[in-house]
Amino acid sequence: MIRAYEQNPQHFIEDLEKVRVEQLTGHGSSVLEELVQLVKDKNIDISIKYDPRKDSEVFANRVITDDIELLKKILAYFLPEDAILKGGHYDNQLQNGIKRVKEFLESSPNTQWELRAFMAVMHFSLTADRIDDDILKVIVDSMNHHGDARSKLREELAELTAELKIYSVIQAEINKHLSSSGTINIHDKSINLMDKNLYGYTDEEIFKASAEYKILEKMPQTTIQVDGSEKKIVSIKDFLGSENKRTGALGNLKNSYSYNKDNNELSHFATTCSDKSRPLNDLVSQKTTQLSDITSRFNSAIEALNRFIQKYDSVMQRLLDDTSGK
């Protein structure tokens, strides 16, 4: 049994490598060798690439077309058998589909294909004149539309949430000095906002791949002295005073703020930071609601696809049963 390429392309390739071409549906297709040669002549690269949004297991990226035998198996996997009755309805449908595949390969400007996308395009090209495929295409297009919107929202929400997290770290530091009625230095004696531990990370590489780090690396830096040597940090003042973030720059910043019962500048500073981040918090709530809505629509499209496939299989099975019973 060959596992579906949509779920895990690595498993699909592993299964294909274990079988002979002769065991695949399209091994005897009259156009198999022609399509293999066409892919080679057009320098089309088909690859499997790990996608963390789709794949549960990590695997190494791999160019499939480097292995001609494997390429032949991929094409034989989706190609149907030649029609027994030449000139009949099925044969005409099949020939039209193969013609579309050839036209697509010859005319498409894209020569770099991820396996999932290539297989989907080949499938639709082969069967584009069938009403069931038209319905499937509408559903899949809906899935892709909502999927793309969901991905963009996730990326935006990750950035917004990361900036809000940095503000929460700053607010916690301010509150610590407020509770002790002390003085906070936000310049050369500031905490280093580049410290991964502030955000709950223990691994430096994971932190460098985080949304927080991507924001912080755009910030200006302050040079401080540590044990007689220079070290660069991203101070609270660097972050708050920078334009390179969603909330923009906070102006007129001092190097330090002290607690004073009569004129509590530290408390005022805490309020200013809170006010600065409040619209960001509102935006995170708004985007979270939008993401929930778009995810619901995406899941509904998947559910519709599953229901359609189940219904289609049921109808086809009944037709086959009726035919065999005659």
From Swiss-Prot:
Keywords: Plasmid, Secreted, Virulence. It holds the Pfam family LcrV. InterPro entries: LowCa_resp_V_Ag, Vir_assoc_V_ag_sf. It is found in: Secreted. GO terms for cellular component: extracellular region. SUPFAM superfamilies: Virulence-associated V antigen (SSF103388). It comes from the Bacteria. Possibly involved in calcium regulation of YOP expression, which includes the export process. This is Virulence-associated V antigen. It comes from Yersinia pestis.
